[in-house]
């Protein structure tokens, strides 16, 4: 793997990279010296921030009906941005919304900035949405310019999805088994976006690694492929000089993601599919206190959340930002002009009793559907009439109170895509989920069950060549051809042919060809012919021809010139006399 010489230092100016294509791959030692870690953020917290930002982009884009290529492009922008900037300087949710906004325009599936902000408002609580400040749209627009300068306007990104489908077409075997392998590998690609694998390896290598991991978990050994005689291992026809150790390292990083995030799955499941037992009628006040830390930190460490998370999220509204390594002066000036103590108090008063209760009262819908229209009246009912004790969940839908005027609307408008998503690029995607993840509750349990299964679930693939073991059709539908009869051996001698005797009164039959009879002599012309002709086949001139006359000077006479066509010769006149 090439070492990133030009991007390893965050202080590299853009003037030195005007005429060179940036390299977006780093070694692990470079990933241990990111700007966030240089400012005192521990690696575990940075990994959690990257995971939460990637899931936020994935969930917002899924609710807006964006294509998976757009979601992956936005997440790649997010990871590259924080290789030059710190999480302490730029909040992750604002950066995630900005990356999704830019990726929609690059992938030709644009969404309005206000729609992205409204969807983010429905997914985040008040503390998390406070990162957007008083003017969220202006925050995203200002950050977009910084994002473009950071990624050096290199907007085109390749993803492992297309390589995964391309490589799957080269495999041989049962189509159902290969489709199951592709579905599992596709899910691993979705989850790998929450890691830094896209900053370490090319998409071709990641596609091979997830196929390798899916084959191991499915107990499906790839034994036949198109270029098997040329390559010893199946992935060498796609990527060369990649040892097994590299694939094993990528697989371990993906599996470590599930072991690290299993305690934090409630943080991501509200964005996807929440389990019904956690949404049973419970007292609202204690549930609100537990829902806020579940979005940002682990439940087992509530003491670490208080000194870090609120201070970091309220930092943009309380004190000016530190200068960042990249040009961030417009963002710093904007913060100093817009924020004021009065607006802080106004923005902090009404929201707290509303948004967290919405998340604990109503089950989130699947990502492909927007929230129902009855969500804003319920949010208003919970916000205005806050009960001091337990509230029965069956009475909540009957409350009809008009929603108050709120600067940040709670509900999300139905998605209005500018164009339908492109058709699936391969037949393996028929009936396949493109937004699946093993980071949810059910997905993690199914992954654990597959990892604990012992013994191959599929038998060995049949050989691709050789005679079939059974008839391809039923015998009385297409009977097989009978074997040909044996050819008799030739006789040792042939008897003479029987010639019938000649019949009297009829002319004798024409003579037949006899190989022992000599051929007749050639017929010559008669000798009385004048002049006598030479024998056929001889081209020599006869002896009676006189020799050509040669003048004394040794030069044969020159024949007269041939008259031009259409001009008859005139006797007795030369050419000069005739022209007179």
Swiss-Prot record:
Gene Ontology biological process: cell division; DNA damage response; negative regulation by host of viral genome replication; positive regulation of DNA-templated transcription, elongation; positive regulation of transcription by RNA polymerase II; positive regulation of transcription elongation by RNA polymerase II; regulation of cyclin-dependent protein serine/threonine kinase activity; regulation of signal transduction
Residues where Phosphoserine is found: 324, 328-329, 340
One Gene Ontology molecular-function label: cyclin-dependent protein serine/threonine kinase activator activity
InterPro entries: Cyclin-like_dom, Cyclin-like_sf, Cyclin/Ssn8, Cyclin_C-dom, Cyclin_N
Listed Pfam families: Cyclin_N, CycT2-like_C
Tissue specificity as recorded in UniProt: Widely expressed. Highest levels in testis.
Variant or mutagenesis effect after changing residue 111 to E: In IDDHDF; contrary to the wild-type protein, does not rescue morpholino knockdown phenotype in zebrafish
Location of region: Disordered: 262-580
Superkingdom as given in the UniProt entry: Eukaryota
Biased composition (Low complexity): 263-277, 285-321, 377-386, 427-444
GO cellular component: cyclin K-CDK12 complex; cyclin K-CDK13 complex; cyclin/CDK positive transcription elongation factor complex; nucleoplasm; nucleus
Pro residues: compositionally biased ranges: 400-426, 477-568
Subcellular location(s) of the protein: Nucleus
Keywords in alphabetical order: Cell cycle, Cell division, Cyclin, Disease variant, Host-virus interaction, Intellectual disability, Mitosis, Nucleus, Phosphoprotein, Transcription, Transcription regulation
Quaternary context: Regulatory subunit of cyclin-dependent kinases. Identified in a complex with a kinase and the RNA polymerase II holoenzyme. Interacts with POLR2A. Interacts with CDK12 and CDK13. Interacts with CDK9 according to PubMed:10574912; does not interact with CDK9 according to PubMed:22012619.
Function: Regulatory subunit of cyclin-dependent kinases that mediates activation of target kinases. Plays a role in transcriptional regulation via its role in regulating the phosphorylation of the C-terminal domain (CTD) of the large subunit of RNA polymerase II (POLR2A).
Family: Belongs to the cyclin family. Cyclin C subfamily.
Pathology noted in the entry: Intellectual developmental disorder with hypertelorism and distinctive facies: An autosomal dominant neurodevelopmental disorder characterized by developmental delay and intellectual disability, language defects, and distinctive facial dysmorphism including high hairline, hypertelorism, thin eyebrows, dysmorphic ears, broad nasal bridge and tip, and narrow jaw.
Name of the protein in its database record: Cyclin-K
Native source organism of the sequence: Homo sapiens
């Amino acid at each position: 793997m090439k070492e990133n010489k030009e991007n390893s230092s965050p202080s590299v100016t853009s003037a030195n990279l005007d005429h060179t294509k940036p390299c977006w791959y780093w070694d692990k030692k470079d990933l241990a010296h990111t700007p966030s870690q240089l400012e005192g953020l521990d690696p575990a917290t940075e990994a959690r921030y990257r995971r939460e930002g990637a899931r936020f982009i994935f969930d917002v884009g899924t609710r807006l009906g964006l294509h998976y290529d757009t979601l992956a492009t936005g997440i790649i922008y997010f990871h590259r941005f924080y290789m030059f900037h710190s999480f302490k300087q730029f909040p992750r949710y604002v950066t995630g919304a900005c990356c999704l906004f830019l990726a929609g325009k690059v992938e030709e599936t644009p969404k309005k900035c206000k729609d992205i902000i409204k969807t983010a408002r429905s997914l985040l609580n008040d503390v998390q949405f406070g990162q957007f400040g008083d003017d969220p749209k202006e925050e995203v627009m200002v950050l977009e310019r910084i994002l473009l300068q950071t990624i050096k306007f290199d907007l085109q990104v390749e993803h492992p999805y297309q390589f995964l489908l391309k490589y799957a077409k080269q495999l041989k075997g049962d189509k159902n088994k290969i489709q199951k392998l592709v579905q599992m590998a596709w899910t691993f690609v979705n989850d790998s976006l929450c890691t830094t694998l896209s900053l370490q390896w090319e998409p071709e290598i990641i596609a091979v690694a997830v196929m390798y991991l899916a084959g191991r978990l499915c107990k499906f050994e790839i034994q036949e492929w198109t270029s098997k005689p040329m390559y010893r291992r199946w992935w060498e026809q796609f990527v060369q000089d990649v040892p097994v150790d590299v694939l094993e390292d990528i697989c371990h990083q993906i599996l470590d993601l599930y072991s690290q995030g299993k305690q934090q799955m409630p943080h991501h499941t509200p964005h996807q599919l929440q389990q019904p037992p956690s949404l049973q009628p419970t007292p609202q006040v204690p549930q609100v206190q537990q829902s806020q830390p579940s979005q940002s930190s682990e439940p087992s460490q509530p003491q670490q959340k208080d000194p870090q998370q609120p201070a970091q999220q309220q930092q943009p509204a309380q004190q000016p930002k530190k200068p960042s390594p990249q040009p961030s002066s417009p963002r710093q000036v904007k913060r100093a002009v817009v924020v004021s103590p009065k607006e802080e108090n106004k923005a902090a008063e009404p929201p707290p009793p509303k948004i967290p209760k919405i998340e604990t009262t109503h089950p989130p819908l699947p990502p492909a559907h927007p929230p129902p229209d009855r969500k804003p009246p319920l949010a208003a009912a919970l916000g205005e009439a806050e009960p001091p004790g337990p509230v029965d969940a069956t009475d909540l839908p009957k409350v009809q109170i008009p929603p108050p005027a709120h600067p940040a609307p709670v509900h999300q408008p139905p998605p209005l895509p500018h164009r339908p998503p492109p058709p699936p690029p391969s037949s393996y995607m028929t009936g396949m989920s493109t937004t699946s993840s093993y980071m949810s509750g059910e997905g993690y349990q199914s992954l654990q069950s597959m990892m604990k299964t012992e013994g191959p679930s599929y038998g060995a693939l049949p050989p691709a060549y050789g005679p079939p073991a059974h008839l391809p059709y039923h015998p009385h539908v297409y009977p097989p051809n009978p074997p040909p009869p044996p050819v008799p051996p030739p006789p040792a001698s042939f008897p003479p042919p029987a010639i019938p005797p000649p019949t009297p009164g009829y002319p004798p039959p024409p003579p037949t060809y006899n190989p022992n009879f000599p051929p007749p002599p050639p017929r010559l012309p008669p000798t009385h012919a004048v002049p006598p002709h030479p024998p056929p086949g001889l081209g020599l001139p006869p002896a009676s021809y006189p020799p050509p006359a040669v003048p004394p000077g040794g030069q044969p006479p020159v024949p007269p010139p041939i008259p031009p066509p259409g001009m008859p010769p005139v006797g007795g006149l030369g050419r000069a006399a005739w022209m007179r």
